[in-house]
Amino acid sequence: FEGYPFGSFITYITDRDRGIIIFASNLAEHTTNIKNNSKSCFTIFSITDTENKQDNARMSLIGDFNQVDNKRREELKTKLRNHLPESEMYLNLGDFNFYKMSITNIRWIGGFGKIGWLNNKDWLNKNIEWEPAEKEIIDHMNQDHSNSIISTLSAQHNIKDKNAKMTEVNIDGYYCQSDNK
């Protein structure tokens, strides 16, 4: 289907700067397409129980996917394992690589009639001052403020877990690990 875009479904992780990172096999159709033409549109959507699916929020990121330098491979494998434990079986296969999208345009739809283009300069943050201290931030939060993590998880996602722990910080907040989800 040369010259035609090809939609696909793939899991992803986000980089600290909000960049999208996928882990894909060289045999996959979407990897072949990335190598032939890196221009891509990556849509993230929220699935809710609303009757009118047009009321669901979604965002389309437009940009180019490029293979990530192998120097980051172990870091990204750990991150993928933490966020998507089901990916473990793929992590040691030799034909899988990480690809990161360089985002050029962002289309946000918050529901029917709530539509707009976002400025990618406002979306991406290349100067992450706290990055060298991420481990210390996480350790401090887990040791001294675990009640806040547990309360936030309960309030935002209705997940009750007294053992919830912060696992990663990003420019939007943080990720938690929970025994209950």
Name each model feature, range by range.
Residues 8-10, 83, 160-165:
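Short small/polar-residue motifs
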Residues 16-20, 56-58, 180:
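Coil-to-beta-strand transition motifs
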Residues 89-181:
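C-terminal edge-of-domain segments
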Residues 29-89, 93-96, 103-106:
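Short, structured beta-strand-loop surface elements
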Residues 1-35, 43:
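An N-terminal domain-cap segment
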Residues 13-16, 69, 107, 170:
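A generic structural motif
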Residues 7-9, 58-62, 117:
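Well-ordered beta-strand positions in beta-sheet-rich domains
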